[in-house]
């Protein structure tokens, strides 16, 4: 198959070879693939809202919201629908095309789930795409989310299956894969990514990308995060910054392996210089979280992003183009599995 074709049969060795090739060759290939499937001067923007903070039962070693970690994040009640409406309107006014709503849960509670469904409906009524990250889902919850009109569901794999037990013990890797399967089976777009800088090896990064690249349907979007060490978590000691070039290699490899997927710069952008971000965009990153907060983590201010986009000649993508790209990916993956 040619460079830029959608494949689901990637081997680990192929991906390691892509990631480890000379930097200029990697960047050229990634940009070539990117231009085959996307406008290289457009960025999709999402805003992330924390609809329920703290008190999560999971033991994710990086997370400030785990009840098992000794952080300063306090458990809060779930946000009211009206507050979500206000945040959605503000995000839309600033140019975001999607509102991602996150709750610190192992899985949604029966009591709170109806309010989540209402949030999906009201945000869609405002003309924004909707995304949720709520933890694991059962079949009935997936069905209800589909009926409510949910566009995307985020469920990150975080790292490779081999390294995963060093980061999380309360939920298995297979649990995460099963939730992704349920969401895809229901026809909801999947958003799933990972975190770089948790002590993993190069092979773990390659294996994570291979896992996504060999899924029956590639995720519609893959957020790539840089670890933000939080005091009170087991990874608070990980103070050595991941080399920017290593991070850019992950972005470029994800672009080549998943040609039609949105590759999103997520948490940790505060640690990247404008020049490093520009190289990420050149490597095929075409989505960011837009707004000064990502759950409990700081993010570049919207005004700074706008200035950077202006310097680079980048435009923020409009909803219709996002929908067209999602449809194209769905059609392509259907053909592959027919």
From Swiss-Prot:
Catalyzes the conversion of dethiobiotin (DTB) to biotin by the insertion of a sulfur atom into dethiobiotin via a radical-based mechanism. The gene is bioB. The lineage of its organism: Bacteria, Pseudomonadati, Pseudomonadota, Gammaproteobacteria, Thiotrichales. Disulfide bonds: none annotated. [2Fe-2S] cluster binds at residues 100, 131, 191, 264. The keyword Repressor does not apply. GO terms for biological process: biotin biosynthetic process. Residues 41-269 form the Radical SAM core domain. This is Biotin synthase. Its EC number is 2.8.1.6. Belongs to the radical SAM superfamily. Biotin synthase family. The keyword Cell inner membrane does not apply.
């Amino acid at each position: 198959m040619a460079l830029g074709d959608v494949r689901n049969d990637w081997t680990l060795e192929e991906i390691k070879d892509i990631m480890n090739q000379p930097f200029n060759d990697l960047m050229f290939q990634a940009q070539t693939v990117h231009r085959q499937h996307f406008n290289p001067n457009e960025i999709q923007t999402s805003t992330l809202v924390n609809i329920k903070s703290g008190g999560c039962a999971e033991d994710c070693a990086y997370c400030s919201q785990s009840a098992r970690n000794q952080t300063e994040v306090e458990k809060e009640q779930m946000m009211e629908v009206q507050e979500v409406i206000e945040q959605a309107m503000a995000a839309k006014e600033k140019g975001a095309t999607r509102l991602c709503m996150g709750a610190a849960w192992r899985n949604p509670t029966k009591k709170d789930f109806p309010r989540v469904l209402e949030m999906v409906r009201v945000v869609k009524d405002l003309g924004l795409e909707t995304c949720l990250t709520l933890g694991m889902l059962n079949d009935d919850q997936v069905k209800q989310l589909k009926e409510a009109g949910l566009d995307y569901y985020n469920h990150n794999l975080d790292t490779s299956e081999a390294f995963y037990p060093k980061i999380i013990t309360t939920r298995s890797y297979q649990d995460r894969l099963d939730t992704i399967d349920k969401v895809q089976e229901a026809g909801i777009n999947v958003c799933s990514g990972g975190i770089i800088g948790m002590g993993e090896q190069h092979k773990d990064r390659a294996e994570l990308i291979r896992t996504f690249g060999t899924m029956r349907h590639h995720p519609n979007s893959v957020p790539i995060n840089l670890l933000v060490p939080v005091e009170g978590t087991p990874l608070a000691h990980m103070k050595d910054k991941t080399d920017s070039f290593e991070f850019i290699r992950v972005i470029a490899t994800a672009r080549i392996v998943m040609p039609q997927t949105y590759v999103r710069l997520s948490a940790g952008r505060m640690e990247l210089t404008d020049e490093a971000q520009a190289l990420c965009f050149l490597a095929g990153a075409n989505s960011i979280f837009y707004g000064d907060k990502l759950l409990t983590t700081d993010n570049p201010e919207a005004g700074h992003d706008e200035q950077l986009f202006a310097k680079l000649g980048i435009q923020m993508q409009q909803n219709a183009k996002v929908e067209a790209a999602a449809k194209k990916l769905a059609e392509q993956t259907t053909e592959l599995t027919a």
